[in-house]
Amino acid sequence: MTLEKGNIAENFELLGSDGQSIILNSYKNLKNVVLCFYPKNHLFACPSKKVFEMAKSVIAVYPDIISTTTVLFAISVDSVDSQAEFVKEYEIPYVHLSDPKKIACKKYAGTNIAGLAKRSTFVVGMDGVIRDVMREINVTSHGQEILDSLNKIKV
């Protein structure tokens, strides 16, 4: 069973595309956290295009997202090296987290039959409570959907 809106966000520690270790609870009482789960980088088909389209829509509003005292992470089962390559290739301004053991992916997004994270986004308030869960993702408008969700949070 995966986490839902209203649940306390479960802590995890994952390595980022920048080589830094990210501990979710380290942001508690400091920042909202957006966790964007997606299946995998560089798939040879539609999912790869969806990853890029989703990244583009988030990048378009990223300055507005971080202005809401928020940090955003994208998470997949890819290795740190793959994440770093993907971030560099597409000039993505936010950190991608590597979850090859599927620790956060299983708790939050759940995994599909291939063992990849299901595409979903979690908005965690500064208090550590999950404020919104998006499972039906429109990749071209997802950045604005994230921003709209953040703007509803009362700090």
Cite the ranges covered by each PLM segment.
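Chalcogenol-based redox active-site neighborhoods
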Residues: 1-155
